[in-house]
Structure formats: structure tokens, C-alpha cells
């Protein structure tokens, strides 16, 4: 073998690692994961779910129940007669119900199962049994009477809660690949999804507004809030420690007033912002004025509006003089809204309003912090109105974060627990209203109440996962109620892994007509992949993270940062003035720490970055986001913003001063200078450089070979088609019961592949095969992207695939719950066809490997009530083989006889004419012909291509990457090496054509990849050199066997009489406008009539020649000795009316009406005339249209020729 040419200092080849992969497959590692990058890809999902039960405060769920607090009710009973007389305001005994602790158990079988060898339930069992993988949700209830006079505790089982795989509540957590295989899982099972009714469901990640950061917005809809409202506003999404959020908005009114808006239980409320300020702390108008205006006393625009703001409040609410009065006023107005307890004073209710609504991220004890932040927001609002700063772009990644699935799961669970407590109180209130004898101190009464309350919270969470619909009283501060979950489809591994890197903008934005939200903005560099997005209606809304982007799932420790900032010269925020043009506000996670000059702020930001990368300063986490916004003319509002919270997008870059890794976020990246390659670095300009340019691409986009040589839409198409490929969804297919699975039997590792291909272990799930491809117009069957396949290659397994289908047979569906079992698998003693035993065993179940066709029996059962043996038959028109038969026990785990089985079919799918194939460059096409080998062209070395494609596929698509892959694959096959196809490893000076051309020349082939070929039909040399190489091809799941529709007759629509649509309903194929135009353009009028009329809704209708109507014609009653005729009611006259019009002739004789002109309508009515009708052929839908228009008073008239 000749020596491979390698450029000095750059390795562009790799090993296939075939033996290493085989060894790892046979002997999975027992100590660690083989592919840690796969685990990192799903970490946001698992980490967010783990945070529910892990953390310094016992997890987010326990923080949530603390925020819920206690629910209170009074029984209205006096302690004794003296209390009733002396204290008329006595409410009775007080009952407080709260949740002390929440815990989620690992999935286990029921305790009553004595036959269970292993009580642990593993995911593979849930998949095969088509059940849900869930653990018990346990709530520790506290039943307190009269503020702790007597406390009762009880642990309640609130149903089975679906558990995320590989989370800390899953049995697979921390298992090695070897142990995973022992438990019937993939050796690298990544988890991150739920199993609901045997289906793998995933909570999709959503883009939401960045937390705890006030954002300036100009939105025309703000002006619709009321009179004098403008389109200016400041919006902040404030997030509690349990990850639930509350959005606060400041509205600017045209008269200078500012209104505070919030939403509570899907209702909006507006409060003057001065009222909120005066309720937060003891303050004066002077303090508010100084706090907002700062040093800008000479700014007349600001001072005039502040004066109007303060005077307007005093004029409207003259009776509110101090904080106590304001709190009481708020409490009085919101007592009913917040369902306050009767024993709470207005003052306490007002304080609760502030705690639950106003800037909740600052806590219940942060009134001063809330006061300062509101002043900052008001000042920013006035700057926006004055034009001093620009509005923030809510569609930019800088102002966005990710709503993780685990956090959303916890938010919904918290609300369901809150509803559970409300239902308990409602049940007690119902007993009180009915006058029942109740005793709060009686534990038996407590048990009776809890028995009558629906405790199955787990089923509600299972409903959310199975449907994706959010049933919420509050709306959870989200903009959509559906579309939260998707099926983690395992069509192939590319599609499966993409689900976990997918992020959606929200279904609300999908309905907008504007395209602003879909645009790819520069701020998303390195965080969202610019290539991996669908090309249809979700384009730009459904994105995928770059492969190096990760999401924070834990709160970084920022407790020491304030002291570090003070040591660097930040003035503490003891003075309540807002940042003017001369001062820079310093904030940490939405809390104002202090103030500093802008010059010093830049120095502090650079110093903090140096120290955090250096790693020698305690208290500075590496993932701290340091966003310094410098002052500018009408730019973003300046300040130094530090972030260390959850749900932030983060990515690694190299920090040049220390040559170490730095973690940056989207907010700070906008104001950083990051070079893409080391060659671009400029001294005193760039502070960072990318590790590699491919960090901006997603996992799938990185796998497209030489994508930098392709037109960008082709790379987008490949990201979509790679997920539609019939590949290898997994290895443990025998332990799955998916409704439909595709598997490529002849998958190969690509000769041309990127470095990340091996890092992510894609060879465990091959997605295609290497094919010898010739670019030649050879037969005429390759027009319009069609491709010709070598028939011998097809016979040797080229693209051979298999489809698996699973059918569940449940005899329990035929009886009600609790009824005795009357149907049993097997054969009875009655008479039944003995040929059934050819397919079925004596137990009534099919033999493994049995060939079944439509109508063949797949199982037999005996019905006691009918004393008869029945069978279930195979319904598909496509023959199959019985692959597996699984016996499924009852979900309640009660020991009883077999009632449910699942049968898996294996359906052969050899490539057929009409099946779709594609390369990895978006070059898709259907198989148009399987060409005999003897007629295929061949090269001088006797090689015949597997695939022939048309040269016209390249010029308009500009997929130069496919040319390069063909060269590289050919050279790699000749030298036995794997070629590196990572983007941007070549340039104009070092081209891939030279690099791979030299390899081909060393092997004795043409430098440019061309070869002389000989005609398979004549044996003569073709007059042109043919471009031949090795390209990795994919077989897509769009197969003709799943889509072809053929029918001569079949069901029709009862209204239009046209064939119904749908392959499953034996419907027809619609001949649309384009097909109609094509037939008209070709002048095939008879074919057009045949398709659109004769074979569709052909009907014969009677039309009146005189009035031109088809609706007024009617069949007459035939007379004796005559035939029935069709007459027109509109053009006829009643016989009685016709008699009155009789006239006499000149000679005095009467004129009689001819009997042939008289006809009856079948109801005894006689008519004269209206006989001028004829029969025409029309589409039935025309008659339907005529009747619909006539109902609206519109008449259609038809001209009939000849008259």
C-alpha cells in the first residue's frame, strides 16, 4: 500500500477503530462511560430534574412547598359560652394544613406482590409492558389546630410520579455500561426522558426572558391597556428560588405617570408605582425624587415627569400618608383576590401582596432591595422615553434563557400540591356548611377528609407528559398551554439525540405573521446553531444548541462577590439613587450591590474576569457571567451586570491573557472581542479566541462532511434528512416494544467523517453505507434527481432494511373492571379449523418466525360465555414475520392468568423503485430503476458503480462538499484510512482537491477523480471521463410501500360523492391544481376528463332548457302505459291555474289542455308544462355547490346548447 500524503503539522486522517469498537461492544466498560460527550448533551435535562430533590435547601420541591405556606380555615365554634359573648369577633378553632416535606421514591412494584423476585422496576420492563416508569410521590402533611395547640402528621401516597431516566430517582443512575447492558438497556443509555404508557416522552426546552433583569421594551400593544397609556415599558421576569416566576411591568403613561402591572391567576392588575414604593419601606417623596434623579438635577425632562408622578399620586390618594396606610389599602383591595385568611389584617394581606408579587427574586426580607430596583427601573423607563437608551431586543439571545424540562416539571408539581391543599380546605368548608359534626383535633376526622380528596397527583403529571397540555389555574407565567412535550422518537440515533439539544421559541410565536422572531441574530453565535433548524413553518423558531453550549442547572455561589466588589471600589448601595449618565449600577442576579464610575466599572469587569479564570480567588465561580455595558449614545442602558443563576446558556472559549478556558454567556459576549481563529487575533483588541470554529455548530451540523463547501440550505436539509434516515436506533431492540421501528441491516462506518463522529460514538448507531457513485447521464432514468441502483448491489444487501411493528392484544378490554375473566388464550373443545395450528401453538400464540399475511391468525382465545374459540387476524396488507411474543402481566401486579400479549412483527424492506435516498449534502432522490449489472458501465479496473446520479444535480445546488467527499472517500478506500471531514480545515492555499488528489495519484488514479468508463451494453469506451468516487449514502424512511395508493373503487364522501382521502381509509390521490394545469398544458383533455370527472364524482343531472336550473327539475309519476319524465317545477304551472287561462278560438270552440302535458309530482299535485329538460353529465360537487349557493339566495343558471 502506498504511503499517505499528509500536510506537515496537520493530521487529517484517522483510524477506523474497528477492533476497539468491537471489543467495547462485546465487553462494555465496568467503571465509566465510553462516550462522556453524550452524557454532557443531555445534562440540562437530567440536572434540572435532579435539582427538584437535590440542593442545599432540600431541593426545589421543598422550597416550593415552603412558598405555598399553609391553608387556613375556621370552624366558627366558640370555645365556651363566655367567649361567644365576650368576643363577638371570634372565628372559632383554626385549622392550618401544610406540607412539611416532599419526597419521590424510586420505581418499585406493589408491596402486595409476594411472587416478585425483584421489587425494583427498571425502564426496560416499562417499555415492554407499555406502562409508565414512575415512583411514589410522598407528601408529609401537617394538620395544625389553633397555631400549634395540637399537631397531627401523616405521610400520604399521592400516586405514581413519572421519573426521568438516569436521574437521581432512577435505578439506572450511576450504572456503568456493563451494568446497563445487564438491565436490558443500551450500553450508553443517556436518559433525560420519561416513559409514559411505554412511550418515551421528552419535555422540550423553551426560550423565555432572562430572569431578574429589567428589559426596556417598546410594544404597540402596551397602548391598549387604557387611556393615556404609551407603548413604552420596562419588563422584568422575577424568579423565585423554587424556579417559579412572576413578571412585573412598568408602564409609562403620556401624562408622566408610571403604573405597575402584574398578573395573578390569569387576571391582570394595575397599581400606581408610587403606591408600591411607599408600601415597601418608610420613605418620602423627596427620597423617591432623589433616588431616581440622582445627580441629573438639571435634566428638565426627568424632573418634570417626576414632579407629575409624585403630585399625581398625592392628588389621587390624599389619604395615604405613610407605609402602614398604603399596606392597609393594598390589603383591603386584594383580600378577595389573594383568598386571604379571615384572621389576617389588611396590613398583613398588603405585605403578602408585596411578598408574592413584587420582585419576588429578592425575597420576603428584601424590601430595601426591591425599593432600589424599582427606582432603577423607573429611571431606565424615563431614559427609554427620552431616547437616551435603546429598547432591548427580546428576540436576542442576550436577553433570553432556557426553561428547562425539570424546572417546568417542578413548577407544575408545586401547583398541583397547592391545589391538593386547597381541595382539603374546600372539603372541610363543605362539611362546615352542611352543619356536620367536626372536630379538628380528631385524627379520624382528618383521615375521613383525606379519603374524600383526590390525592392522585401522579396521574395529573402523567397527563401533562402524555399530552403536553398545561392545566393550570395560574398559567405559570407562561405564554402557551400546549406543546410542552414531544415523543423522543428513535427513528435513528441522530433524531433521538437531537431531541435533547432542541429548544423552541414557543407556540405563541408560531402564530405570528411577522418574521422578526425567526431571524438569526449575531448574538446567538456559539449558542444556537445557525444551520440546524427546519426549513418549514418552524424555521427559526425550533433551534438546536451548539454542541459546546451547556445550560446551568445550579445556582453558583455568589455570596462572596459583594465583598470582592467593595474591595475593588464599588460604593455600597446604602444610598437609594439610581444610575445616571455618570454612574454605573452594579447588580448581581437582579440585586443592586452598589455604584461606581464607568471607567472604574470597566476595570472591575476585566479584573473579575482575570481572577475567575485564574481560579485563585475564592468565591468567584468560573461560570459567572460578567456583562459590562459601556455608556453610549442611544445604546443599551449602561451598567455592570453579574449573573450566576440557573438556566443560563454558557460556552467555553480560550482566555488569551492566561491561555486558559473561560466560560462566557450570551449577555457578556456582545461586548467581548473573541477571535474565531488564532490567525485573526489582534493585539490589544481580542481578549479571547475560539477553541475551534466548529463550536458554533450543533452535533448533527458537525457531522455533515465538508459543510463549508456547500450552499447553506443544503446543510440545513441534511440536518433534517439525517433525522429521517432508516438507520440504527439502538442495539437493545429486542427489549423494546415501539409501535414502529426502522433498522438498517447493512450499516457501515463512513470513510469520510468528522472528528466528533467518533467522540459521540456514532459508529454504535450506523446511519448509512459507503457507495461507489458515478456522475453520468447514462440511461434517461436519472432525470430530476432520480438515481439508478446496481441490481447486483441490491441483491447483496445494498440499503437493506427492516421495519418492526408491535401490536398489543388485550383480552381485558372486552370486559368491565371487576368482572370475572371469561376469555383465555388457547383453544377450546369446540369445533375450529385445524389449519390454525399451522400458525399458532397450543397456547393460542404464534410461533416465532412464522410468516403471516393479511387475514392469517396471530392468536386464538376461548370465550366462556359463547363457548367458542375465536382468533385475531393480521390486518396489514404487507406480509411479515413474527419476531417476538411478549407476555404482559397486569399493571396492578395481582397474580392472575395471562390476559395481555404484545406481538412484534418484522417486515422486510428491500430498496424498491420509489424509495428515497440521499447523500449527506442534501442531495436526495428516489430510486428510479434497478439496472442489471451486465448493462452497468465499468471502469478499467472492472469496478461498477453502485449508484448512478445525474450531473445536473450539482450546478444549481452547489454542493461542492459532495465532490470533495467523493474524492476523499475514494482515496480513503484505496489507502484503507478514514478521512477527516471537519469543516474549515482547508483554505484557499491548502485545498482539498490538492490534498486528496495527491493521495489518488499515489494510488495510481487520476488526480481529479475522473476515470474512463466503458458502456455495459456495447463495451465501447465512453467519450467522456466520468467522475467516480465513494460517497456515504443514507436510505430515508420515506418508502413507497408506506405511501403508494391504488384503487379502482372505494369509499366516497357522502356529501360530495368524491373519493375520500387517506391511505388507511382506502382513499384516492388528490389531483390538485398543479396536476390539473400540467394536464391542461399538455392538451390531454380526455385524460383530464377521465381523472377529474369519470373517475371522481361523475353523475347525471337533469337541467331545464328554459330556466337553466338543475335544482328545480323533478321526476314525474309515470302513468299507466307511459314512462316517467323529468319536468321543471319552475317552468310549469299548476293545473288549477292553467284552467283559468283557457281561451276560446275564433269559431267559438274551447281549447283543451293536452293530457300529455299534464304531470304529477307524487303528492297529488298536477302541473302543466315544464317538459323542456335534458340530461347532462356533471360533477356531483357542482350540484352540491349550487344547493349551497341557493341557500344564500344566489341562483346559478346554466346555458344548454343546442336549445
From Swiss-Prot:
It comes from the Eukaryota. Its EC number is 2.7.7.6. Signal peptide: none annotated. The modification Phosphoserine is found at residues 81, 1156. GO terms for biological process: nucleolar large rRNA transcription by RNA polymerase I; ribosome biogenesis; termination of RNA polymerase I transcription; transcription by RNA polymerase I; transcription elongation by RNA polymerase I; transcription initiation at RNA polymerase I promoter. InterPro entries: DNA-dir_RNA_pol_su2, DNA-dir_RNAP_su2_dom, DNA-dir_RNAP_su2_hyb_sf, RNA_pol_bsu_CS, RNA_pol_bsu_protrusion, RNA_pol_Rpb2_2, RNA_pol_Rpb2_2_sf, RNA_pol_Rpb2_3. One of its GO terms (cellular component) is nucleus. GO terms for molecular function: DNA binding; DNA-directed RNA polymerase activity; ribonucleoside binding; zinc ion binding. It catalyses: RNA(n) + a ribonucleoside 5'-triphosphate = RNA(n+1) + diphosphate. Pfam families: RNA_pol_Rpa2_4 (PF06883), RNA_pol_Rpb2_1 (PF04563), RNA_pol_Rpb2_2 (PF04561), RNA_pol_Rpb2_3 (PF04565), RNA_pol_Rpb2_6 (PF00562), RNA_pol_Rpb2_7 (PF04560). It is an enzyme of class 2 (transferase). Its main location: nucleus. DNA-dependent RNA polymerases catalyze the transcription of DNA into RNA using the four ribonucleoside triphosphates as substrates. Component of RNA polymerase I (Pol I) which synthesizes ribosomal RNA precursors. Besides, RNA polymerase I has intrinsic RNA cleavage activity. RPA190 and RPA135 both contribute to the polymerase catalytic activity and together form the Pol I active center. In addition, subunit RPA12 contributes a catalytic zinc ribbon that is required for RNA cleavage by Pol I. PANTHER family: DNA-DIRECTED RNA POLYMERASE I SUBUNIT 2. Three distinct zinc-containing RNA polymerases are found in eukaryotic nuclei: polymerase I for the ribosomal RNA precursor, polymerase II for the mRNA precursor, and polymerase III for 5S and tRNA genes. Present with 14100 molecules/cell in log phase SD medium. Component of the RNA polymerase I (Pol I) complex consisting of 14 subunits: RPA135, RPA190, RPC40, RPA14, RPB5, RPO26, RPA43, RPB8, RPA12, RPB10, RPC19, RPC10, RPA49 and RPA34. The complex is composed of a horseshoe-shaped core containing ten subunits (RPA135, RPA190, RPB5, RPO26, RPB8, RPB10, RPC10, RPA12, RPC19 and RPC40) where RPA135 and RPA190 form the DNA-binding cleft. Outside of the core, RPA14 and RPA43 form the stalk that mediates interactions with transcription initiation factors and newly synthesized RNA. Belongs to the RNA polymerase beta chain family. This is DNA-directed RNA polymerase I subunit RPA135. It comes from Saccharomyces cerevisiae (strain ATCC 204508 / S288c) (Baker's yeast). The gene is RPA135.
